[in-house]
């Protein structure tokens, strides 16, 4: 205690605002340090944890070990994407543009219906309920128009789903496909860091269900297709 009083004086000009624990048993260390700091009248000192942290380690310390940290410093696992170091995106041909400007749907055949791509030029939409919460995403043909306030029939992408078809009436709809590069040129104004943060925050609060954010067994985001898309896929498969 005498060491803490000397190390962290109450002089406002020299007051330490936080203490970082970076090694050893982090949760246990936070409890011991919090108890010691409180005992010498320094509850204002915040505790920060770091050292190879990720969302699972943080959840374990908070939920099961009852750590006394005020904030967590995540670096390595935030920028390296340790669980998914490689983006496995693959471009597949879905349509060929004809001289008259129309598109002919194309499809890569597969032995598995679940792996067969969805043919045709398409436009994804997001549908919202009366509270402004996103209900699901909908894959439509590019020339289809999805309107707010009008019933929309959707077909489940999962062929084994109990309810294959459902109809809802969204109060708001939004196109999700926004061109960023056209003819090799940037087509949008790049957002600032603050705008990016605000966009992500809105995605997590209004565009995503809480059940989709669970660390364990998260709920899958609903993605359906219009009957026109389902029919095109069925005819070509």
What are these regions (language model features)?
Residues 24-27, 33-45, 53-237:
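Gly/Ser/Thr/Ala-enriched C-terminal appendages of enzymes
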Residues 50:
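Short hydrophobic "strand-cap" motifs at the C-terminus of beta-strands
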Residues 1-32, 36-41, 47:
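Glycine- and Gly-Pro-enriched alpha-helical subdomains that act as flexible
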